[in-house]
A protein has these predicted regions:
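Structured soluble/peripheral alpha/beta segments that form catalytic or ligand/cofactor-binding pockets
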Residues: 1-338
Length: 338
């Protein structure tokens, strides 16, 4: 199983600072009018890093802190960075929080998050700069908690209004600039063991249904050692976050990828909300990132009530592949600390 928590207090570090533990804070945002998307992750311990995996069970999160930032436009990646960082801090005080990982910062104050973006490092060809503010639109402050497991998923701000500015530079010259306005998402994950300890693989995604509602889903397919797990929520700017009851997730149109993983490109989500039947179809529109154990997608949603397409971000993660020495070798690029 997986430990699931819903609520704004999910930002606060919750794990015991012991070897082999990790925590990360994830943000994504989409500007529909400019076909821009960005994903931002702050890591206190990088459980996908081959260096981290080699150091288990004694991996120290302080030695493997860092960030991952990727910028996309029109379904294609413009730039992306994954760096371990030397200078890091995590400061909490009541409902405020500040994290710095190298040149990347995020500050929480009340229901808003301000993220400062600076990926520049010596000899870098490209760099992303800017500042984005995520305003959580859920004023209901609903809470929910269920399940047990090594991994904890904390759903914090699944429906945000996002505004700010971004720029992409090449060799210190600004190549492109944008004023960003769109919708966004934020969650946090933490754990006490390797990601493959509980499940082999999973599907996760968040997608707008309309201007007021977002669907969030997590699905662990059945494996030889683990039962299937399907969980979903609807985030409503008026009524808050509600769990999808009797949630059923069906994987369709499974295809073999270039990295020899079988991944569904259509996902049907069924269940009930307040006694009303729910049926939402998610399709993978563009593969934004792909590798030997991970795919990130730009996705579209469709319902009987809202047949037009709305966008979101999704991932497929094959944790079992992280056990492979071949896969670890493939992703073992030189570790730059910035």
């Amino acid at each position: 199983m997986m430990h699931v928590k819903v609520g704004m207090d999910g930002d606060l570090p919750m794990r015991v600072q012991e070897p082999g533990t990790y925590e990360w804070w994830y943000f994504d945002a989409i500007d529909e009018s400019q076909e821009l998307a960005i994903t931002i992750i702050f890591f206190d311990g990088m459980p996908m890093s081959p260096y981290w995996l080699e150091a288990l069970p004694n991996a120290d999160s302080r030695e493997y802190s860092g960030y991952a930032v990727s910028l996309y436009r029109r379904g294609k990646k413009l730039a992306g960075f994954v760096h371990h960082t030397e200078h890091n801090e995590i400061i909490t005080h009541q409902d405020e929080m500040h994290i710095r990982m190298g040149g990347m910062t995020f500050r929480k104050s009340g229901n808003s998050y301000t993220i400062g973006i600076d990926t520049d490092y010596p000899d870098s060809v490209n760099s992303i700069h800017g500042e984005l503010t995520f305003h959580n639109t859920d004023e209901q402050k609903h809470t929910y908690e269920d399940g047990k497991g090594n991994h904890c998923w904390r759903l914090i701000a699944p429906q945000c209004k996002v505004e700010g500015n971004l720029s992409l530079s090449q060799y210190d010259d600004i190549h492109s600039e944008w004023t960003f306005e769109g919708h966004g998402y934020h969650d946090c994950n933490s754990g006490t063991d390797a990601l493959y300890a509980d499940y082999d693989d999973w599907y996760w995604g968040r997608c707008q249904i309309d201007n007021d509602q977002t669907i969030i889903y997590y699905h662990y397919p059945m494996s030889h050692e683990n039962e299937e797990l399907s969980i979903g929520f609807i985030a409503d700017s008026v009524h808050g976050i509600k769990k999808i009851e009797q949630c059923r997730i069906q994987l369709e149109n499974v295809k073999l990828t270039s990295s020899l993983m079988r991944i569904a490109s259509l996902i049907n989500i069924q269940g009930t909300i307040d006694g009303e039947e729910l049926n939402i179809r998610i399709s993978h529109a563009h593969a934004l990132e792909f590798g030997p154990f991970y795919y990130r997608y730009l996705i579209e949603s469709e319902t009987n009530q809202y047949p037009h397409n709305n966008h979101g971000i999704a991932e497929y993660f094959n944790a079992k592949r992280l056990k492979s020495r071949l896969v670890r070798t493939m992703i073992k690029t030189p570790m730059h600390r910035v």
